[in-house]
A protein has these predicted regions:
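Short, solvent-exposed loop/turn segments at secondary-structure junctions
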Residues: 48-50, 133-134, 178-180, 204
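Short histidine/acidic/glycine/proline-rich micro-motifs that form metal-
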Residues: 72-75, 205
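Serine-dependent carboxylesterase/thioesterase catalytic core
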Residues: 38-47, 54, 60-69, 76-169, ...
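Alpha/beta hydrolase fold serine-hydrolase catalytic domain that processes acyl esters and thioesters
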Residues: 1-22, 136, 140, 147-150, ...
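Flexible, membrane-associating and regulatory peripheral segments of lipid-active enzymes
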Residues: 1-43, 53-55, 62-67, 95
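C-terminal catalytic-base region of ester-bond hydrolases, centering on the histidine
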Residues: 167-225
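Short, surface-exposed alpha-helical segments at coil->helix boundaries
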Residues: 53-57, 184-185
């Protein structure tokens, strides 16, 4: 499987700006979506930046107890330990009645799935945004070389079979066929389990966390819990 075409890769950043501009247009409508009337915590895990602030604030507007992952920049396994990441869940579990939903952008979605696999009893659901957990992901991403440079030691998380196995909780994979960073096929969850859903949106990879359609689907899926 090949990485996205170079035209998609080179245009992903500019298209992310367009995603953010469209979000401003649709923001008034998104803010009118029903607010939750239940205790429900959400942790948002980043890709490789700290651009999840607007999404977190939007989820708080809808009544969710939402936070980032509180581990700094996500540069791969060196950015955190499993203990530090799971311990960051504790205050959210207390605020959310014992469970939390996880939303992960790109690499953050892979770690969200991993957390759900380790502690499924504490996870409502997992929503991934352009996360390359599918088979062949290492060869199908323009970010692979940078990731390997930052994380030279082999990591068990890189195993195709273990990554592609869905966690034992409801899982939604949001993807875009115009993804300029990873081959969109690696962001799909295979299988026909009723707890697994793949949702296509139009947009860039970088801008998935600032995409109006993505915000709509996140709000919809969280409300279903």
């Amino acid at each position: 499987m090949q990485p996205p075409h170079m035209l998609l890769a080179l245009s992903d950043g500019p298209r992310a700006l367009a995603d953010a501009a469209c979000l401003q247009v649709f923001s008034p409508l998104l803010r009118k979506l029903p607010k939750t009337d239940r205790k429900h915590s959400v942790m948002v895990l980043p890709g490789d930046d700290r651009g999840n602030g607007p999404l977190i604030r939007y989820l708080r507007h809808l009544g969710y107890t939402a936070t980032g992952w509180r581990q700094g920049r996500n540069l791969g396994p060196q950015s955190f330990t499993e203990e530090s990441l799971t311990s960051a869940l504790e205050p959210l579990l207390d605020a959310g009645g014992g469970k939390v939903s996880l939303v992960g952008h790109s690499l953050g979605g892979i770690y969200a799935r991993e957390i759900a696999g380790m502690r499924p009893e504490h996870i409502h659901q997992v929503i991934t945004l352009g996360s390359p957990f599918g088979k062949g992901h290492q060869q199908a991403s323009h970010a692979s070389r940078l990731y390997q440079r930052l994380n030279p030691q082999p990591d068990a998380r890189d195993d195709d079979d273990s990554l592609n196995t869905p966690p034992p909780v409801p899982t939604t994979a949001i993807y875009t066929k115009a993804d300029g960073v990873v081959n969109w096929r690696t962001s799909l969850q295979q299988g026909d389990d009723h707890d697994v859903h793949n949702i296509e949106v139009v947009g860039s990879h970088i801008g998935l966390n600032l995409n109006a359609a993505v915000w709509f689907w996140i709000a919809k899926k969280l409300a279903e819990v």
